[in-house]
């Protein structure tokens, strides 16, 4: 790893955000194999790219970014898709559920996360200008359900540029409004 395990006394965790790519809850690169190393050295056996990458991480955030493959799926199917993603041992967090635009059973999924010791992410990008009010309201419902059922959350900026790192003011405000 490029970063040390600790830096100025703070333990650094290495993570990756990975797309859920189908209704079975599989993560990106679950089906991509390779059998050569970086220097064209032949490996003893083929490796699965997704497992190889996630094996170097402390955790993964499983998220939806493209949902065309879920067109016509039922609420039950979408809920099960997320549950299946949680079966991946690398997945610790389900990412930005409020803006996925997919209909799932919020209490059922929150209970599943709670019971498995997994987290649900809330991030600032969902609150950015141009995001639909429905996504922000959906985040509120998810956060309230997490509070009611005792599911832990993670929150952050979802920064895609250095100037946005640690900017989570709208998420913090929304969470503070939930008692």
Predicted regions mapped to residue ranges:
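Extended substrate/RNA-proximal surfaces in nucleic-acid metabolism proteins
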Residues: 1-118, 176
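Charged catalytic cores and adjacent phosphate/nucleic-acid-binding surfaces used
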Residues: 76-93, 97-179
């Amino acid at each position: 790893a490029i970063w040390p395990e600790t830096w100025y006394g703070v333990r650094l965790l290495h993570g990756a955000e990975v797309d859920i790519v189908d209704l079975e809850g599989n993560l990106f690169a679950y089906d991509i194999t390779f059998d050569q190393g970086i220097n064209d050295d032949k490996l003893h056996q083929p490796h699965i790219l997704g497992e190889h990458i996630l094996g170097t991480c402390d955790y993964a955030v499983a998220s939806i970014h493209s949902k065309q493959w879920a067109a016509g799926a039922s609420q039950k199917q979408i809920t099960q898709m997320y549950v299946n993603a949680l079966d991946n041992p690398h997945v610790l967090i389900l990412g930005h559920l409020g803006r996925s635009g997919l209909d799932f059973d919020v209490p059922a999924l929150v209970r599943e996360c709670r019971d498995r010791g997994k987290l649900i992410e809330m991030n600032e990008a969902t609150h950015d200008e141009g995001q639909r009010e429905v996504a922000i309201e959906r985040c509120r419902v998810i956060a309230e359900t997490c509070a009611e059922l005792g599911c832990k959350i993670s929150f952050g900026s979802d920064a895609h540029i250095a100037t946005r790192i640690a900017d989570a003011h709208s998420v913090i405000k929304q969470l503070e409004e939930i008692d």
